[in-house]
Swiss-Prot record:
Ligates lysine onto the cytidine present at position 34 of the AUA codon-specific tRNA(Ile) that contains the anticodon CAU, in an ATP-dependent manner. Cytidine is converted to lysidine, thus changing the amino acid specificity of the tRNA from methionine to isoleucine. Its main location: cytoplasm. This is tRNA(Ile)-lysidine synthase. GO terms for biological process: tRNA modification. It catalyses: cytidine(34) in tRNA(Ile2) + L-lysine + ATP = lysidine(34) in tRNA(Ile2) + AMP + diphosphate + H(+).
Length: 398
């Protein structure tokens, strides 16, 4: 399928963005996206994320910068730190990239982030999620458009194949770089791209298109499911608690999905399959006082006819070592413990949430992040040089 420049431009324009942010790696996908998007009469900012892994990463950065200078586009580069021990590089780098994109987006009234994912990326992601044993939400893979806390992210090339994109680049004499680390099969995505997909193409030459279609079907089905479940959840909830007698009137599969949705809405965390099974068994044989530890911070209790989320300990039971460990994991930098102060929350405490220009009262941030009111009193304020740098166990400031 040939890329229609007019269709891509019209799709971007329908969001009426004040500014366009492009994740620009210099590869063929983002180079084509940049080449098309620069024709819009909308301020455009290209962002290059330097992962500092490849010997040519600085050359690529210079290439991207020079391309932006050629077209008189704003260019921003950002260098990632070393991945923390025990973290998956792919997952960590993805989070770091998105965090920086959103930090830049906060500066504008209605920003739209453009990413160059294509049909082959979608097929690879679908396989990755299938290998993990994911449900509908995971198999939906890469969303075409997603609302962010500030602005949105659009992938206008998602329906086009890599071959389509390379053909457009050749036809329009677009210069781009090639990252030979894409051949390194120690990374799971590269293994799937370079070894598994070619085998599947022997069975179905259009495998990427087929898997991409399956991902779209899963996304549509999941959207419908979530809307129906959300409506049902409201009818069997009392504040943040679940009414057990109403829940168990429903089919088992609906119960399990509602348990997962209920916990995620109230904690922003997901239950594991094993936890859902245990929880489902418990609500169908309810015993007041029953409880299960979900993570280091959450417990689920049965109290009479209600399912309740609680912290496993009171705030006074949480040691300074636990808080420092959490801070070290989330701050991704060395901490001078002599400069750290930990105290309880005060009514007028403010925090400049990551990516924002101005501080907000914690009450406002708690509301925006949908942190349950029952949990907010458990917050610990972490200060360095008299400045709030984090709110344990919820988020980092800065």
């Amino acid at each position: 399928m040939s890329i229609s420049k007019s269709l891509v431009l019209n799709e971007i324009k329908k969001f009426s963005p004040s500014h366009i942010i492009i994740g620009y790696s210099g590869g063929v996908d983002s180079s084509v996206l940049l080449n098309i998007s620069k024709e819009l009469d909308i301020p455009l900012i290209a962002i290059y994320i330097n992962h500092n892994l490849h010997r040519d990463s600085l050359k690529w950065q210079i290439h991207c910068q020079q391309t932006c200078q050629k077209y008189n586009l704003q260019f921003i580069s950002h260098s990632l730190d070393k991945v923390p021990k025990g973290e998956s590089f792919e997952a960590w780098a993805s989070k770091q990239r998105m965090a920086f994109f959103q930090k830049i987006m906060q500066q504008y009234s209605k920003p739209l982030l453009l990413l160059g994912h294509h049909q082959d990326d979608q097929a690879e992601t679908f396989l990755i999620q299938a290998i993990r044993g994911s449900g509908l939400a995971g198999l939906a893979s890469i969303p075409h458009y997603k609302e962010l806390h500030h602005g949105g992210v659009l992938r206008p090339l998602l329906k086009y194949s890599k071959i389509d994109i390379e053909g457009f680049a050749k036809l329009n004499n677009i210069s781009y770089i090639y990252d030979d680390s894409n051949e390194d099969i120690k990374y799971r995505r590269n293994l799937i791209r370079n070894q598994i997909i070619p085998i599947l193409q022997q069975v179905n030459p259009n495998i990427s298109q087929t898997l991409s279609r399956s991902a779209n079907i899963c996304a549509e089905s999941n959207n419908i499911l979530q809307k129906l479940l959300t409506e049902r959840l409201q009818s069997i909830s009392q504040d943040t608690n679940l009414i057990i007698s109403e829940l168990i009137k429903l089919d088992d599969d609906i119960q399990k999905n509602l348990l997962h949705l209920w916990f995620k809405q109230n904690t922003q965390q997901s239950l594991k399959s094993k936890q859902i099974k245990e929880l489902h068994l418990a609500v169908n044989n309810p015993s007041t006082g029953w409880q299960i530890d979900i993570s280091n911070y959450y417990q689920i209790h049965i109290q009479y006819n209600q399912l309740i989320i609680k912290y496993p300990t009171t705030i006074n039971d949480i040691s300074k070592e636990d808080i420092i460990s959490w801070l070290s994991k989330n701050l991704n930098e060395e901490i001078d413990l002599t400069k750290i102060v930990i105290r309880d929350r005060k009514p007028d405490d403010k925090c400049k949430y990551r990516g924002r220009n101005k501080p907000n009262k914690l009450k406002i941030l708690f509301q925006e992040l949908q942190i349950p009111t029952t949990e907010r009193s458990k917050a610990k304020i972490i200060l360095k040089d008299q400045q709030i740098i984090a709110v344990y166990p919820f988020f980092i400031c800065g």
